[in-house]
Amino acid sequence: MEIKTNRLYIRNLYETDWPQMKNIFIDFNKSRYAIYDRPLPTEDDEVKALTKQFVDSSLFFVIFTLDKNEMIGYVCFHKDKDKYDIGYCLHSRYHSNGYAYGSTKVLIAYLIKNYGANIFTAGTAIDNIPSCKLLEKLGFTCVSIETVSFNDKFSFQGGNFKLDLT
């Protein structure tokens, strides 16, 4: 799958993309929002393994700028019955430029057209304001809030978002 917009090139992830994925992972782990997610691997073997796992999911897409042909992030989906749960991560150099919105909007339309998807879900920390705003701009609404923890030392309020196009 390949999609070009006026600013972006979006395609399926390949196993050979692991070095660029490693750069995205390292950048994410430095982010102030990393505490709201599981840490991403940074060792080559672990990055290769996770990249392969993502490739095998078949709903994992990478985003490149057209002008620099540089991978700037990814958008992925996990199918759960009739719902598609969305995840995304962009390198911090590309935040606040509309790339997350543009790529996610195009990929939601792609899943609607090619997979018959009409219900999308997402989870994010309520304190991750940029992520919450992105989801709301895409038409998602927060349907519930719950306490989330990925370890015994830290918990936070997570919002469960939904976009229902039925």
Residue locations for each model-derived region?
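A short helix-loop-beta-strand connector motif used in the catalytic cores of GNAT acetyltransferases and
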Residues: 50-62
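Acyl-donor (CoA/ACP) binding surface of acyl/acetyltransferases
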Residues: 1-31, 64-166
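Conserved GNAT-fold acetyl-CoA-binding loop/helix
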Residues: 29-51
